[in-house]
Structure formats: structure tokens, C-alpha cells
């Protein structure tokens, strides 16, 4: 990505243009592929592009508006990705790199203060709802292995989030 006009002035590139750029990068990959995308708008100082001022709810905490913008950016990303042949056979894993401000007392408790969301999306599989069981970033690897049907032994400290079977470390 080489367009300084899209620099947010703090961390990197605004989410929407960056995700559109990354979609074009994914289009050039041979399958199967693994790719990691890290967006930055939901980090301090919690600002969004000026052209979107007033379009996203400011909510209860400064980060809410940024999350609205990131959500919009992901929607635009997926609208484009759905047109590609690789989309239906792709597993998308969303997670955060750290916890942050909260409006809910549940997350003020010590054990929940470091909570991060993990979301799985696989277009050709029905994942619906919310699972509030304790999970960790360590669980992503065995979950992906489970989703792709990997049936060989492997070492992991985590466990699959879609299976009730326990994987020994």
C-alpha cells in the first residue's frame, strides 16, 4: 500500500482503504493460502476519517465510533470478497490484540478485564450465535485444524472451539 493520503496520522492506514487493498492482494494468491490482516482504527486516539464524521454512533466510550467505522469497512470488504472464487472456501478468524475500555460491569471483574473477542466465519458453514465459554488465542490453531478436517496428530496448548473433543497437548 503506497498512498500517504490514507495514513491515519497515528498508527497506519484507515481500515476501509486498507481492507480494499488487502482484498486485491488476496485475489492474487494461489490457493490454499493463509493471510493475516491487522487493522488499526480501533486503537487510540479513536478517530475516523473526516469524510465519515457523524455517520457512526459515538456510543458510551470513545472507541465505539471507531468500531462502527471498522464494522462498515469489513462490510465493504466482504461485499467485494463474496465475488471471488476463493471466498466460499475460506475461513475468516477475527480477534483483537488486547482488551480495552468497557461500558459493561461484567468486564470490570478481574478475570474478564483481559477479555478479547474471537469470531469465526466460514461462508459455507453455519456458525450462528454466541458461545460464552472461556477461550483463548491458543484455541485458534486447533479450531482451524478442526474446520479443515485435519485428522493427523498435532501439538497445541489450545482446544478446538467447535468440537467437544479434547485435544491433548
Locations of the language-model features?
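Solvent-exposed soluble domains appended to multi-pass membrane proteins
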Residues: 1-169
Amino acid at each position: 500500500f503506497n498512498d500517504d493520503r490514507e495514513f491515519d496520522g497515528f498508527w497506519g492506514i484507515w481500515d476501509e482503504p486498507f481492507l480494499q487493498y488487502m482484498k486485491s492482494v488476496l485475489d492474487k494468491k494461489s490457493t490454499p493460502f493463509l493471510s493475516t490482516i491487522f487493522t488499526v482504527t480501533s486503537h487510540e486516539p479513536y478517530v475516523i476519517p473526516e469524510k465519515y464524521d457523524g455517520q457512526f454512533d459515538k456510543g458510551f466510550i470513545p472507541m465505539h465510533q471507531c468500531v462502527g467505522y471498522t464494522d462498515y469497512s469489513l462490510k465493504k470488504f466482504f461485499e467485494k470478497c463474496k465475488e471471488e472464487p476463493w471466498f466460499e472456501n475460506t475461513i475468516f478468524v477475527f480477534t483483537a490484540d488486547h482488551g480495552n475500555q468497557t461500558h459493561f460491569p461484567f468486564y470490570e471483574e478481574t478475570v474478564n478485564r483481559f477479555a478479547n473477542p474471537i469470531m469465526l466465519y466460514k461462508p459455507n458453514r453455519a456458525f450462528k450465535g454466541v458461545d460464552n465459554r472461556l477461550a483463548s488465542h491458543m484455541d485458534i490453531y486447533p479450531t482451524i485444524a478442526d474446520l479443515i478436517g485435519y485428522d493427523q496428530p498435532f501439538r497445541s496448548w489450545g482446544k478446538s472451539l467447535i468440537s467437544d473433543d479434547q485435544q491433548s497437548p
